[in-house]
């Protein structure tokens, strides 16, 4: 899978308002070129944030050798060249999402 964090997409939209830096009427793929496996992200979150462990699925992480060739590759060079390539990782994006959900639940007594 590839990741597009909403903060990165929003930043790209704001940057695109500057017509001197971003050519108009072009399409850009706004995504990290990092390939990731949701099972590995969930396992890392469980390990690094034990207070969330009961909220996250306990899934067997497949060895990298079993994942090779299972993902499509994408070329993000055009978007990276215009907007920069400093995208949030899938791990950071999902960690922020889980934290937001837990915080919302606390505030709303869910």
Model-flagged regions — what are they?
Residues 4-7, 36, 88:
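Residue-level signal for the nucleotide or nucleotide-sugar donor/cofactor binding architecture
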Residues 12-64, 98, 105, 109-110:
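Mid/C-terminal beta-alpha module of Rossmann-like enzyme folds, strongest
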Residues 85-86, 91-109:
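Conserved C-terminal helix/tail region of periplasmic/extracytoplasmic solute-binding proteins
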Residues 2, 34, 72:
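Residues that recognize and position ribonucleotide moieties
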Residues 63-84:
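Conserved C-terminal active-site "lid" loop/helix of NAD(P)H-dependent oxidoreductases
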Residues 1-15:
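Substrate-positioning beta->alpha
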